[in-house]
Amino acid sequence: MAKSARRRCKNEECREWFHPAFANQWWCSPECGTKIALERRSKEREKAEKAAEKKRRREEQKQKDKLKIRKLALKPRSYWIKQAQQAVNAFIRERDRDLPCISCGTLTSAQWDAGHYRTTAAAPQLRFDERNIHKQCVVCNQHKSGNLVPYRVMLIERIGIAAVDEIESDHKRHRWTTEECKAIKAEYQQKLKDLRDSRSEAA
């Protein structure tokens, strides 16, 4: 019977040529066979441990996600109003980024706010109305109570007297629901992304 073709021993420390006695023999001696078997077993164990660790992490993340969902479900309406307002304000600041403060006209400020013409306390129904919110320096917004007289003058110039009259005559109170606020947050996060993307493409 003809000898089978030579092959190299798969023991990395050996790599000798040999003639295998059978098709699936990859070691030249019992010692090399033992070493190869131990290494293979070690690799299989390592693979199984990695798979188990991956599964554990996946389950852990799943539990964290469930806990997060439960926690969010328990958040009060005020939390979602704040979340929605933050999203709207971020959009307004980006929309008006190249404009001066609507009240004093400054182009420099330690901080830029999204200032309401009619306040959220006086007209909560207008708290998310883009016409009622404009980029404003921190001094005018927080230290001059909105600096509303020059705000109104510039507001008329920006959106027109008809829109300003509409804002000033709107007295229909509205109680924002949690679901409305969630939807507004998502809408304005997307609007902010779209605005930034369009500006990047135009640059």
Swiss-Prot record:
Entries under InterPro entries matching the protein: Phage_lambda_NinG
Family matches, as Pfam families: NinG
Region (Disordered): 39-65
Family: Belongs to the ninG family.
Name of the protein: Protein ninG
